[in-house]
Regions:
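ATP/NTP phosphate-donor binding region
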Residues: 1-85
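Glycine/threonine-rich beta-strand-loop-alpha-helix active-site module
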Residues: 67-74, 78-174
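Glycine-rich phosphate/pyrophosphate-binding beta-alpha loops
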Residues: 137, 244-277, 347-349
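C-terminal charged capping/lid subdomain of soluble metabolic enzymes
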Residues: 163, 300-369
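Short alpha-helical scaffolding segments that buttress acidic/His motifs in well-ordered protein cores
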Residues: 192-196, 239-247, 261, 281, ...
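Active-site pocket-lining segment
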Residues: 264, 268-326
Length: 369
């Protein structure tokens, strides 16, 4: 028995930002975004369509932490009249911040207590969110959780509530044209990881796998060309659509081992999330092969009959994009690597992985690099 559910209404297509006024519908709104000129310009376009924002939060940082989020929630709580909807304009960090603000309308302390102890759920708020992603990869526009970082304690939390699904996702590939090469690659690899991680996942189902196969196949086929032709609108549309399908895939499964490994790497070494969660994919794939008929069938739809050769091709794909699959290139020695894997296998996301630690250890020496 399986179930699949996703309540987000998706509007996809070049120029679809023009529909933002219909989504806000004369409600007072809070805009959450980055303090960068390109986002100022898009914010002005939103204001022309939906009216001026009641509050603009521009202090979003990569990997939003407790300090930044506490300030954002305080601003939101102090705004009168209270915003009735949040417009999240940006990448994954903006989406995460917007979801925390949506839940922290009474202040960040309620969110903090819920994250740390699972307490005070009744104190969390549920302001609706309209998600406007400007990167192709986060998937957060169609999921119900946010990644929150407690940098003081060196911990990563996941804020997960059904009310955190955005009501609408407005996905306009035109907003992604200006993304630089490194960001284009890292965000697309995050989407690739979402897709593959939903396949080698205990929570996988035929619908999530269908979305994942499409997404992974498109990213593998299109990303190398896009990396060399960043202004190609057709390729941007393909990658944005693939990232959306990857989001729909893992929205019902969550991620697995590669993501579980990645979080301490980002915290300790500053490795961008999309790279941290993708460089280990060949190793994780090798440890998943042969564990589940359904998983193998899904992977064969992407990589062909010989899955070992497919893992090698995945490795070559990453290296050709300039992404090393060697842990040492991220400042990780053998001892830390084994500690990361042991910890990841027992983590919340690692427990979704269909393979065993013994299989992972066996795969460590495989591959061509």
């Amino acid at each position: 028995m399986w179930t699949y559910e996703n309540p987000v209404r998706i509007r996809f297509g070049a120029g679809s930002l023009s529909g933002i006024g219909d989504l806000v519908r004369d409600r007072a709104y809070c805009l959450v975004t980055y303090d960068e000129p390109i986002f100022h310009d898009i914010a002005q376009r939103i204001a022309e369509a939906a009216g001026p924002a009641a509050l603009t939060i521009r202090n979003v940082i990569p990997n939003p932490d407790f300090h930044m989020l506490a300030d954002a929630c305080a601003l939101f709580a102090a705004t009168q009249p209270a915003p009735e909807v949040i417009v999240a304009l940006g990448g994954g960090s903006v989406m995460d911040a917007a979801k925390v603000v949506a839940a922290g309308g009474n202040g960040f302390d309620a969110v903090k207590r819920y994250l740390e102890n699972g307490e005070n759920a009744d104190a969390l708020t549920s302001t609706p969110i309209v998600a406007v992603p400007t990167t192709a990869g986060t998937g957060s526009e169609v999921t119900s959780w946010a990644t929150v970082w407690d940098t003081d304690a060196g911990r990563k939390h996941s804020l997960s509530r059904p009310s955190l699904y955005p009501s609408d996702a407005l996905i306009d590939p035109e907003l992604m044209i200006g993304m630089p090469r490194a960001l284009t690659i890292s965000t697309a690899l995050d989407a690739l990881s979402h897709a593959l991680e939903s396949i080698w996942n205990k929570n996988g189902n035929p619908v999530s796998t269908h979305h994942a196969v499409y997404a992974a196949s498109e990213i593998l086929a299109v990303l190398p060309a896009l990396a060399d032709d960043l202004g190609n609108r057709d390729l941007r549309v393909q990658i944005a659509q693939a990232a959306t399908l990857a989001g729909l895939a893992f929205s019902n499964t969550r991620t697995a081992l590669a993501h579980s490994i990645s979080y301490p790497i980002t915290l300790r070494h500053g490795t961008p999330h999309g790279i941290a969660c993708s460089f280990s994919l060949p190793m994780v794939m090798r440890s998943a092969i042969g564990t589940s008929d359904a998983c193998d069938a899904g992977l064969r739809r992407i990589f062909g009959e010989d899955l070992s050769a497919g893992a090698n091709r995945l490795e070559e794909f990453l290296v050709n994009l300039g992404v090393s699959v060697n842990k040492a290139d991220y400042g990780i020695d053998d001892g830390e690597w084994r500690e990361l894997i042991e910890s990841a296998m027992t983590g919340e996301r690692g427990r979704n992985f269909i393979g065993s630690e013994a299989r992972v250890n066996k795969s460590l020496g495989a591959g061509k690099r």
